[in-house]
A protein has these predicted regions:
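Positively charged, low-complexity/disordered segments
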Residues: 183-185, 189-195
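Structural preference for solvent-exposed beta-strand-turn elements
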Residues: 1-180, 184
Length: 195
């Protein structure tokens, strides 16, 4: 694998996916980001086995390939490189990732890309489409009710339910229960008049 990418594009893509990766992980491959280079695109994938985030960005691909490299280390390198620099990523003869930008040179260890866990969408029974703005608003209005207690891990999330073209987000901490209708629900709903 060999590619060239602008520092800002790499930093933006890594910034999105590295948030899922924990710095210290008992499963080493989960500390890495999967990088796939082909057809003029670099795809970055990170997971913690609960969430998977992928980001696609344009890159000049000289040799296609797929590797996994330490996510936070690569992000820190990209963050400290000068603005406007071209970053060259390539696998060297020792099966390590060389990161070159101007006079800077880094070599990172790799793990086999075949060991990276793949989350598939097979088996999901529901699918929905919503704008990023509306989805963000739906989550933001609901997340205050999420439990933060480690002993009640089953309440540490938001339940999203779609039915008959409507989407609801529900969260509870055991004391509070909040349900947020989708923006489409709010536009259609009417409060009954007082009698």
């Amino acid at each position: 694998m060999r590619l060239s990418i602008e520092r800002s594009a790499l930093l933006k893509a890594l910034g999105h996916v590295q948030n899922v990766v924990e710095r210290r992980n008992t499963i080493p491959i989960l500390s890495n980001v999967l990088m796939s280079a082909e057809d003029g695109q670099l795809t970055l994938v990170a997971t913690d086995l609960d969430i998977e985030v992928s980001e696609i960005t344009a890159a000049d691909i000289s040799a296609p390939g797929q590797v996994t490299a330490p996510a936070h280390t690569l992000y820190d390198i990209a963050r400290k490189l000068p603005d406007g620099s071209q970053v060259v990523l390539q696998i060297n003869a020792d099966d390590r990732l060389d990161v070159d930008a101007g006079r800077s040179h880094f070599t990172l260890p790799l793990l086999p890309s075949g060991d990276f866990p793949k989350m598939t969408a097979d088996g999901f029974t529901h699918e929905f489409s919503i704008s990023t703005k509306d989805f963000s608003r739906l989550i933001d209005k609901t997340r205050f009710a999420i439990s933060t207690e480690e002993t009640r891990y089953y309440l540490n999330g938001i339940y999203i339910h779609g039915h008959a073209g409507k989407l609801r987000a529900v969260a509870t901490d055991g004391c509070l229960l909040y349900t947020s209708p989708s923006p489409r629900d709010r536009q259609k709903s009417r409060m009954p008049s007082s009698a």
